[in-house]
């Protein structure tokens, strides 16, 4: 996978003939200089800085609640600073090619922490029609991200379709992260044709989060899923 995959494979978040929500959405594909990027981030934070994942409101336990907002809750562990931009709640649309079956999907991705040296990763994906309307659930994926002192990323993921995966990788730069399958296990009722692969996550010029997943098919990597997500909390 090349770094350019992120811009060539990830669809725009205003797919399905949606009107752009604001001028920054309409110009998402346009490169920004440093000052423009900072100004855009400040503008966007006015809508998301006060939002967070809701507490459970159950009996207290002697542990900190998860937070997807770096302004609220426990401080981010110093060991996670290289992953800091990922923390938040992200939502948008994407495209999938699952062994020849192509479909569009919506996704909400929560990347949260509780002050310990890991990030919680929680993805929910639903299928959508050509107008962007939901036509039913697709899959869920939960797991944890860790990173060593040498900037080696370790990811464990469990997928509701019957998949367990361990991935390793490293930051591409301070706004992009690439991971690769080290072990992919499919359960007896899971998708037998699902092979190992690579993922690339990165912040786009408009500060949305894009990601690309490529999987081995017929001996070579092929596009599997990709999406572009807008920060809605954090």
Where are these regions (language model features)?
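Amphipathic/hydrophobic helical signal segments and adjacent flexible N-terminal regions
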Residues: 3-118, 218-234
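Well-ordered beta-strand positions
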Residues: 84, 112-113, 146, 170-171, ...
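Bulky hydrophobic/aromatic packing residues
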Residues: 2, 85, 145, 209-211
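Mixed-charge, glycine-accented linear interaction segment located at domain edges/termini
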Residues: 186-234
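Residue-level recognition of well-ordered beta-strand positions that form the cores
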Residues: 89-95, 122-124, 144, 156, ...
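Central antiparallel beta-sheet cores of small beta-barrel/beta-sandwich binding domains
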Residues: 100-191
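Hydrophobic core residues within well-ordered beta-strands of beta-rich domains
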Residues: 86, 139-141, 197, 225
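Signature of extracytoplasmic/envelope-associated structural regions
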Residues: 49, 54, 136-138, 194
């Amino acid at each position: 996978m090349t770094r350019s995959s992120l811009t060539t494979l990830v669809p725009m978040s205003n797919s399905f003939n949606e009107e752009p929500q604001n001028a920054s959405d309409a110009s998402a594909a346009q490169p920004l200089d440093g000052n423009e990027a900072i100004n855009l981030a400040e503008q966007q934070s006015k809508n998301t800085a006060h939002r967070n994942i809701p507490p459970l409101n159950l009996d207290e336990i002697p542990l900190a609640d998860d937070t997807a907002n770096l302004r609220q809750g426990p401080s981010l562990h110093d060991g996670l600073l290289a992953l800091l931009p990922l923390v938040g709640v992200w939502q948008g649309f994407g495209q999938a090619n699952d062994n020849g079956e192509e479909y569009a999907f919506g996704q909400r991705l929560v990347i949260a922490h509780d002050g310990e040296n890991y990030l919680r990763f929680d993805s929910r994906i639903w299928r959508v029609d050509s107008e962007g309307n939901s036509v039913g659930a697709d899959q869920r994926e939960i797991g944890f991200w860790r990173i060593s002192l040498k900037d080696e990323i370790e990811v464990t993921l469990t997928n509701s379709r019957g998949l367990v995966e361990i991935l390793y990788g490293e930051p591409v730069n301070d706004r992009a992260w690439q991971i690769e399958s080290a072990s992919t296990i499919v359960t007896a009722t899971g998708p037998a044709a699902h092979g190992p692969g690579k993922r690339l996550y990165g912040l786009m010029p408009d500060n949305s989060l894009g990601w690309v997943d490529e999987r081995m098919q017929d001996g070579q990597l092929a596009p599997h899923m990709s999406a572009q997500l807008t920060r809605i909390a954090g």
